[in-house]
Amino acid sequence: SVQDAMNLLNVDDFHLVHDTPDNNRDLDAKPLHSLIEIIESSSPVSLEKIEPTMVAIPTIFSHHQDHVHVHNACIAALRPISTPVSDIVLSYEAPEHSRWSATGIFEPNFFVEIDDVIDQKIQAFSKYKSQIRPGGRDADSIRNQAKYRGQEVGKNLCEAFYVHRFIL
């Protein structure tokens, strides 16, 4: 379950906007302004409530329409006129994003070495059973993607991101 994965990753609080198995099928039909409001202020873990320094969001290059919708809502909620402004905003990649997209190709410009946490990442993902499937959403695909991204930057295993904002 999501709760099991969050526990394994020591995530102390989270909010599922759609918390039943069928709800993610219509997330992209939810008005964008209502998702923006959830992200900005109404969620228990909203930007206003937790004031995160770093936020990672789905990439626009996902072939999942609900992920693209959430990406667009996040970009609007994280605009630089928001209060507070998160210093670091990144789009993350999932293994299947490099295989099929109608909107473009994920081109990362920020890499994080994950040698020490790859097993924990795979174990956490394995708790989210409804999301496991061959061809991008399985342990081998996660490890292979990390190897590929690591090779791009001369490291062993890396996770790749696209930087939207990075303020030091």
What do these predicted ranges mean?
Residues S1-D13, D26-K30, V85-L168:
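The feature marks non-catalytic terminal segments
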Residues S1-V85, V153-N156:
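Active-site beta-strand->loop->alpha-helix modules in alpha/beta enzyme cores, enriched
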